[in-house]
């Protein structure tokens, strides 16, 4: 798959930042030249074969490479896994997400897997056991305070690994893990042709059967990484095992709960599953949107709903070939109100965030409207007329127009509602409005249509960026072009009610940043530019691509500035790394040196925060 220049540069700098210059040089060569053998990498990078192998070893350990063995020469050829390389920038977000969901123990395990790369379970257990033995050795901590361990026993480590494997945040390395999607597809194609179509594909029916068998083969390859999860599912999920233990009069102590989990095969090699991590980060981002727009209580309810819905969602974007299902299999996952209520903590006050208006002022037909089917795929920008949408929403009672808005969220007495009814009010609130965070798909059943929801949020993000870059006038002009299509300058001027000079200046400004484009239409066959008509138009996909490239370029700039600052303050940073200075910089360093060190740390935090903010935009535009 082709990678834009800015992303290739960003991934190379991230590898350099985390793993050093040698792996980064090898990675940059693979980005520039494509699939290469060790001999060719050495030739193009001017590195020795030994250096190349050392660099490849580091990259392979952290799943940053694909490789395949050439059938003719017998040489292994390597190519970049750019998705895993870019996901290195999301390490902090992933650890924070795991900490919130699985506690410090889960965070500690994920952090070690991120640092170590692919790891055999027995090696991970041995490393933790050595650390536990070291801390439990009282003689080693006579004068120092004994550190607190997140993982205190092998049983706890096994239990945490089981939780993370069941959540698909960790998956298993198998024989085809290090083959690219293109190589796997070619291999499955060959196998299907050899087994089922040795005489060739003849006719439409045979072609459909061929595609189905290829999809089935690719699905089997993808499921190989879920072997540990399937074994755990055979013993029942974590909650089921605890319920069975309670039924057998187990006292529910944490140590005994850990012993309920089956021992994992120590020979299995595991790694971080970034696809599932991105699904969890998407849920986290959606909850943040709801917190900002509808309040924290509604956001908490939405978080519990997403947690239930995404249990069996392994990736944000489905593969059109592998995930092609028959109409009978296309069942949208949904959750009931009671299932969500079971997960909501009793300490959460569900009355918060609900409007206080009389029930007679609410249109039941509109509020309780069901939408059994997901909306058809639409381009968000093509539906600009809100009045048409309002007419299609349903029949509203006349009392809606006469509603006393002063009583909303005011001091009017709140009608007594049961806890399930309070929860339903939050869910109905989520189902209303333009983004459509939730769809009321059945009687007390709720689902989320992620594809149209994310399209709407992308459109909102693009509008926000256009407004910040080109102002309100620029956003207004772009919306006119989206609604009306291609327009000449005179027609655009009459619709926008702007002066010609201001219009030309604003459109030129937006053309330079990639939000607006022009098309030349000649009046005759001579195509004389002086006699041609120039039409303005807005290409949304092109605007997305331009914005994504600029985001990568900005991240590259941040990493380059950080490296320049490191070189500038190299003497101070080397002093701060000394064992007798580390942790006591203010006491051990001179005032001038400490001021430089503190300024560097502040600038580093600002640059990292800027990269995280840009990554939020990138994730929304291309990953979610």
Curated annotation (Swiss-Prot):
DNA-dependent RNA polymerase catalyzes the transcription of DNA into RNA using the four ribonucleoside triphosphates as substrates. Specific core component of RNA polymerase III which synthesizes small RNAs, such as 5S rRNA and tRNAs. Residues 551-572 are annotated as: Leucine-zipper. It comes from Neurospora crassa (strain ATCC 24698 / 74-OR23-1A / CBS 708.71 / DSM 1257 / FGSC 987). Coiled coil: none annotated. One of its GO terms (molecular function) is single-stranded DNA binding. The keyword Transferase does not apply. This is DNA-directed RNA polymerase III subunit rpc-3. Belongs to the RNA polymerase beta chain family. The keyword Zinc applies. GO terms for biological process: DNA-templated transcription. Residues 385-403 have a biased composition (Acidic residues). InterPro entries: POLR3C_WHD, RNA_pol_III_RPC82-rel_HTH, RNA_pol_III_Rpc82_C, RPC3, WH-like_DNA-bd_sf. It is found in: Nucleus. PANTHER family: DNA-DIRECTED RNA POLYMERASE III SUBUNIT RPC3, RNA POLYMERASE III DNA DIRECTED -RELATED. Keywords: DNA-directed RNA polymerase, Nucleus, Transcription, Zinc. Residues 229-260, 373-418 are annotated as: Disordered. One of its GO terms (cellular component) is RNA polymerase III complex. Component of the RNA polymerase III (Pol III) complex consisting of 17 subunits. Pfam families: HTH_9, POLR3C_WHD, RNA_pol_Rpc82.
